[in-house]
């Protein structure tokens, strides 16, 4: 079961929530809490409507969804869960200048945030790996069916459930953040024992480092594949140059996905690692809240990156332009199939991303 926190004598080796008096009292000024509250309110509203719209539009064409789209929609589910289940707790607490939901609410909020956050990251990992295999190994797209996507979703939720439930069964806990109006995984457990260090290291590796490595590897390989493929077929027909715009867009999308994730979560991860293995008291309270607020913004712009840009919801702008572009690419595909077999395979890469 989760640890039962009670007041203990003052000791520098104790975590902040055991030695700083009321752990749920805000350590920020009223003004800072109000700013944080309004910021999270705006982020929460935009995220809820953005991800809700994505799910609504997807439900209208649910029978036509491709396997990769099904996995990507799961990202919107995770982000919507963070916005609906998590953000109201912090927003109310910011406006009240203290955490008002007690230890039970703290553990629920910490679990929900970690659960949907982990699910979101693992979904990103699955999508990036799927795209890497489909772009770099064309035969992969032939056998991937909708049922495989649903199996992948089940594995994602099982993975997230396993790691986020472990702190509730005695291997850790969810505790207040140093600034008092939010809760998180007990990173400070690593300061107390070797067992705590092992647990935190496992969390960091399986829920952050490994997924991040897969995402970066996948998109670097995709970028390299698209660039090399363009060079191989560019001299066969001048019409291949029309795909250069698409190539640049794909490169930018991959960079946005990686950059968006890194910008949102790496600062929070750095602070968490320092809290676990460094000198947590050396981090100013006012500074510790910034990575938390930044990480919470990921639920807002993820639907923009994954749904609007990558899956081209904006393609509804002009049907004529889309039809012309499709016709041009299909014509070139037929031409290359009859002349150079290799070039047709490469063109599949570009069409797969359209």
Swiss-Prot record:
This protein's GO CC annotations: cytoplasm; photoreceptor outer segment; plasma membrane
Secreted listed as a keyword: no
Membrane spanning stretches? 34-54, 75-95, 109-129, 151-171, 198-218, 253-273, 289-309
How would you describe the post-translational modification of this protein?
It is uncertain whether Cys-315 or Cys-316 is palmitoylated.
Query: Could you tell me the membrane topology recorded for this protein?
Result: Multi-pass membrane protein
Tissue expression, as annotated, is:
Detected in brain and retina and cell lines derived from neural retina.
Location in or out of the cell: Cell membrane
The residues that the database entry marks as glycosylated are 4
Q: Which Pfam families match?
A: 7tm_1
Q: Which UniProt keywords apply?
A: Cell membrane, Chromophore, Disulfide bond, G-protein coupled receptor, Glycoprotein, Lipoprotein, Membrane, Palmitate, Photoreceptor protein, Receptor, Retinal protein, Sensory transduction, Transducer, Transmembrane, Transmembrane helix, Vision
* PANTHER family assigned to the protein according to its UniProt record, in alphabetical order: OPSIN
- Name it: Opsin-5
């Amino acid at each position: 079961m989760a640890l039962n926190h009670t007041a203990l004598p003052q000791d520098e080796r104790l975590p902040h929530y055991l030695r700083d008096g009321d752990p749920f009292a805000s350590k920020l000024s009223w003004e800072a809490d109000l700013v944080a509250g309004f910021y999270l309110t705006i982020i929460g509203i935009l995220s809820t409507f953005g991800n809700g719209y994505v799910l609504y539009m997807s439900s209208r064409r649910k029978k036509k969804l491709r396997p990769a789209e099904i996995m990507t929609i799961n990202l919107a589910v995770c982000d919507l869960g963070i916005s609906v289940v998590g953000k109201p707790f912090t927003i109310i607490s910011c406006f009240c200048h203290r955490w008002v939901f007690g230890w039970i609410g703290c553990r629920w909020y910490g679990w929900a945030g970690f659960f949907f956050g982990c699910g979101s990251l693992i979904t990103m990992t699955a999508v990036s790996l799927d795209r890497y295999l489909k772009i770099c190994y064309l035969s992969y797209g032939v056998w991937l069916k909708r049922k495989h996507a649903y199996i992948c979703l089940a594995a994602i939720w099982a993975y997230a459930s396993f790691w986020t439930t472990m702190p509730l069964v005695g291997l850790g806990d969810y505790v207040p953040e140093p600034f008092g109006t939010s809760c998180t995984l007990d990173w400070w457990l690593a300061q107390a024992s070797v067992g705590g260090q092992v647990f935190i290291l496992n969390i960091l590796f399986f829920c952050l480092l490994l997924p991040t490595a897969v995402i970066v590897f996948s998109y670097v390989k995709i970028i390299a594949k698209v660039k090399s493929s363009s060079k191989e077929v560019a001299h066969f027909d001048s019409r291949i140059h029309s795909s250069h715009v698409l190539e640049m867009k794909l490169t930018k999308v991959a960079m946005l996905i990686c950059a968006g994730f890194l910008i949102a979560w790496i600062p929070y991860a750095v602070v968490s690692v320092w809290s676990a293995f460094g000198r947590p008291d050396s981090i100013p309270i006012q500074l510790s809240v910034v990575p938390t607020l930044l990480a919470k913004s990921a639920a807002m712009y993820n639907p923009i990156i994954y749904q609007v840009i990558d899956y081209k919801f904006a393609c509804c702008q002009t049907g004529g332009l889309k039809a012309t572009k499709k016709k041009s690419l299909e014509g070139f595909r037929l031409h290359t199939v009859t002349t150079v077999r290799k070039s047709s395979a490469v063109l599949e890469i570009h069409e797969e991303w359209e």
